[in-house]
Amino acid sequence: LAPQGDLMIGACQGTLPPHLAALLVALPEQDIHLPRGWREREVRQKAWFKAVAGMGQRPDFIGRLGDIWVRSFEGADASTTTYLVSAPFDCVDGALPNENTAEPVRLAAGSCEQAYVRQRVYQVGSDGVPQDITAMAMPAAPSIAEADRARHRAREGKVILDHSKLQYGPAMRWFVQYPESPQKTGPHSFSDWNREHLSFVVWNGTGFELRDTVTRAQWPCDPVAPGDKPCGGFPDSGPDAYVLAGSTVNSAVSSP
């Protein structure tokens, strides 16, 4: 997500919704590398959070606490609420960075001094213990042919999973970001910002799935100033053939 100041438009500031706070406190210490006592103190402090229309009886929520953010996804059964957590899960000691890894963050407490921020998916069991269901619930990144991967590298493209629209709806987006240049990107280019589409990741009420296209309701534009062109701000300006105006979407994933 964007830096904290830009994280959530129209967000509230206060203590996190109880189920988000309970999840963050209950995460196994061996997962998150931050002592439970530290987390118990932190969730009592002011944080930014926002309700998002979802598919359950209660709204989804997104909240941020320092370098940690969490997004809940509701379904028909509140007992199966799913949480996407972005946190310092991989301690630098023993974790190998890759070409798309951001710099590690320094931890405020615990025995791990620095860790890489990753995303994991959790559900809370009947015993109150969060279970890591990432491998089951989150589809792998879309496959990229070796020729396309070589083309990305030649143009200094970076594969990114965009979480920024989770403050509005149920979708994330895989794309390739190229440096600012007049050079045209590949056949799946979109927007005015040197980007190439790979796939969306969409919550469907029970899990996440890859989709080639979504509706505008699933991928809303950021608000713009009064009088400005709708969908005219960063990062929404420019053509985007993968966001449809209608209500029907194609679940097939394109091959970049």
Descriptions of predicted regions:
Residues 77-88, 96-109, 166-176:
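Acidic/hydrophobic-patterned starts of short beta strands in beta-sheet-rich repeat architectures
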Residues 130-246:
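Short aromatic loop motif centered on NTY/YTY
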Residues 65, 108-109, 115-119, 156-159, ...:
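Short, surface-exposed coil-to-beta transition loops
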Residues 11-13, 90-92, 111-113, 220-222, ...:
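Sequence contexts marking disulfide-bonded cysteines in secreted/extracellular proteins
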Residues 1-78:
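Terminal domain-start segments
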Residues 254-256:
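Short, solvent-exposed mixed-charge patches
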Residues 91-99, 103-137:
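Mid-length scaffold segments of soluble, non-membrane domains
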